[in-house]
Amino acid sequence: MLFAACAFKVRQMKLCKAIYLFLGVLSIQASADRLYFNDLPTPKSLDDLRAIQEAMQSNLSRARGATVCLQIGEGSGSGVIVSPEGLVLTAAHVTGGVGEEVTVVMEDGTEYQGVSLGLNAKTDAAMLKITESGPFPFVEYDKNDATRLGDWVFSLGHSGGYDKARGINVRIGRLVREAETTIQSDCMLIGGDSGGPLFDMTGKVIGIHSRVGASKEESMHVPLREFQAHWEKLEKSDFVGEGPFAKKPVPGSGFLGMMVEDSLEKKGLRVTELWEKGPAEKAGIKVGDLILEVEGGSATKELLKSTLGQLGSGQKILIKWTGGEETKEKDVKLEDRP
């Protein structure tokens, strides 16, 4: 029994030593990964300034290649690609909703089509996906929340929209404040930068531009931890939270803008009236056309009414119709009632 007890204590001591050694290695690794100038209150020499400059420049090309301009309707913002398949992080107030069609403009002007995924209306976090085939240039994002106040950072964005001649705007600064759902830097941001990336000096995305404070030097960003907290929901196109950055669709508020009646000669609904410049007319539906399907089901007044009763302004309804010999199918975006 005495021998067994001693052997157990020896194993305990070895295990503790192994754990301490492992934690020590992690600590050393973390220290090794941390750039020394982040811990200086201010740069003390020309060498310090050169080190900051070289760190940013070594990561700038890749960062620029993954930073995109997002064109949604008549507005534009910025975003950053974080996967070769084309997953983009941006701000909720840029996408404005779930399922929005987006034109994604690369640094060289190449355009791809995409669709907005989920968003968090409380924190201003949002995702979208490029729907065309990749691979696309991308950058890594911070998964460990390793940045600290005072760390040097740089921001990228398409200020005022895409401008090939000007290129992407780059600003350098430091983290100056941190709150639960926001980090603040002194990188100057203006309109069009919203949704763009904030990088640490190792080239990882640590935040997404949200808004400007009392002055242009007080820039607010959504930290990556806020994306990670709801990552799966955002990827699944969920509308998360309630807040000022996006308006949640109210069921039954969506307006299609057409009147129909049961067709006597063929199965479906005959269009009898259209609201001028309404959603149905914009989609190409004409008076006299025959609605064949609503959301994949045979078109009836009951199905159309019940489906619209579940959808709000900004959401889409799948309509299949025929006009003469041509059959069309389209997601029609609903609007506010006039």
How would you describe each model-predicted region?
Residues 53-57, 66-85, 110-113, 138-140, ...:
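A conserved glycine-rich beta-strand in the N-terminal activation segment of trypsin-fold
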Residues 85-89, 206, 280-303:
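Conserved PDZ fold ligand-binding element
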Residues 76, 83-125, 130-135:
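Catalytic-histidine neighborhood of serine endopeptidases
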Residues 34-60, 102, 136, 159-162, ...:
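C-terminal cap/linker of serine protease catalytic domains
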